[in-house]
Amino acid sequence: MKTDTSTFLAQQIVRLRRRDQIRRLMQRDKTPLAILFMAAVVGTLTGLVGVAFEKAVSWVQNMRIGALVQVADHAFLLWPLAFILSALLAMVGYFLVRKFAPEAGGSGIPEIEGALEELRPVRWWRVLPVKFIGGMGTLGAGMVLGREGPTVQIGGNLGRMVLDVFRMRSAEARHTLLATGAAAGLSAAFNAPLAGILFIIEEMRPQFRYNLISIKAVFTGVIMSSIVFRIFNGEAPIIEVGKLSDAPVNTLWLYLILGIIFGCVGPVFNSLVLRTQDMFQRFHGGEIKKWVLMGGAIGGLCGILGLIEPEAAGGGFNLIPIAAAGNFSVGLLLFIFITRVVTTLLCFSSGAPGGIFAPMLALGTLLGTAFGMAAAVLFPQYHLEAGTFAIAGMGALMAASVRAPLTGIVLVLEMTDNYQLILPMIITCLGATLLAQFLGGKPLYSTILARTLAKQDAEQAAKNQNASAGENT
């Protein structure tokens, strides 16, 4: 009897253990539905705000250009008006940033990276209106900036806003929704959902806590953001360059050469960005009046430049198809490239609210097309198409500068719908990234974040020192 009882108890214990193991196994992949629901909300909001931001910037640009068209026959009015309109619009952006939310200046992507590490604040109630309205001013003025930086920062801040509205206190939820909003923001800017996901995994890999919950939330947010974008803007690729021919195997070595060129250009470009930032900091010294006037002057010059050489101003999306089609000579391509390098440095490094992705894509297109046209002359037996080198170069500068080759490859392929060029793009972007790393170049966003944190620590140390001095007196 005792033996039967012992056997029965042993069997019950085994059953309970198995049941507990099955329960734990089932719960291991049980993503909290609340986080997925909030990720869907964040993605939807980011898509709506991203589309609204794009439409608002286009409206400001059209209003400015429309005003200039009215006086196009009167040169004595046209040139001053072009300067004044762009200067005033730019000054709005600079003033709002400096006065209400300094963290909204520049791209905003380093701020999201810092927030993921709990090193930078997320004041969404300030950043959202400042980044939106300020970006309308600077991008509407025709400055050489992109809208992807604002939408990424706006998306991340929307993620924190949703978290606060639903009163979630979990550190995991806070981190996950911030990353979800950032990924949805990139997707909303470029209609590139896969690039948005890869951007979080690759570019923000030191900060992103990869687990089943976070990655499912990012997927959910990006899906919703992309759906919203396509409802309003359609499903066509954001950059229309047409279907280009494949790259024959015997020409792939040329793409490696192109990657080597960008591997040299990337670190130099990053160094110029940082040095220009230091130059502007020395000029205005943190004084809001000097900073706003400086921004107005840069904006006004971009307005004038838009009259002289329209291709040298603006984010660059309109320039990319024209350049990739081979409508410029090699000399003119290089001239526009140098001009846009200068304008990109002035606009981005001055702290204007706006991104640098779009300007870098345009720069890569210009240099890639110039290389392709030169190679076509040097190697006529290959029957090369310059547009394929334009596509490869478009992602190569981003890969070398930001050190995110996968994101650069997928982003360009999604934006242009030329997936058949994936092999030459891999060769170009990988070559650019490896050489940039070998030359000692540092990722641009990580370097900017490190400088921001160093400045933050210095300011905090100065405050503590002043407080101690006050107590001693």
Swiss-Prot record:
Q: Its GO CC terms?
A: plasma membrane
| Stretches buried in the membrane, not crossing it | 109-116, 177-189, 193-201, 387-401, 402-404, 405-416, 417-421
| Superkingdom of origin organism | Bacteria
Q: Which residues lie on this side of the membrane: Cytoplasmic?
A: 1-32, 117-123, 167-176, 202-214, 282-287, 439-473
Pfam families cross-referenced by the UniProt entry: Voltage_CLC
Q: Where is this motif: Selectivity filter part_3?
A: 355-359
Q: Where is this motif: Selectivity filter part_1?
A: 106-110
Binding-site positions, chloride: S107, I356, F357, Y445
Q: Where is this site: Mediates proton transfer from the outer aqueous phase to the interior of the protein?
A: E148
Reactions mediated catalytically: 2 chloride(in) + H(+)(out) = 2 chloride(out) + H(+)(in)
- What InterPro entries does this protein's entry cite? Cl-channel_ClcA (IPR023861), Cl-channel_core (IPR014743), ClC (IPR001807)
Q: Give the keywords, sorted.
A: Antiport, Cell inner membrane, Cell membrane, Chloride, Ion transport, Membrane, Transmembrane, Transmembrane helix, Transport
Q: Does the keyword Translocase apply?
A: no
Subcellular location(s): the record lists: Cell inner membrane
Function recorded in the entry:
Proton-coupled chloride transporter. Functions as antiport system and exchanges two chloride ions for 1 proton. Probably acts as an electrical shunt for an outwardly-directed proton pump that is linked to amino acid decarboxylation, as part of the extreme acid resistance (XAR) response.
Query: Which family is this protein grouped under?
Result: Belongs to the chloride channel (TC 2.A.49) family. ClcA subfamily.
Q: What is this protein called?
A: H(+)/Cl(-) exchange transporter ClcA
Which source organism?
Answer: Salmonella paratyphi C (strain RKS4594)
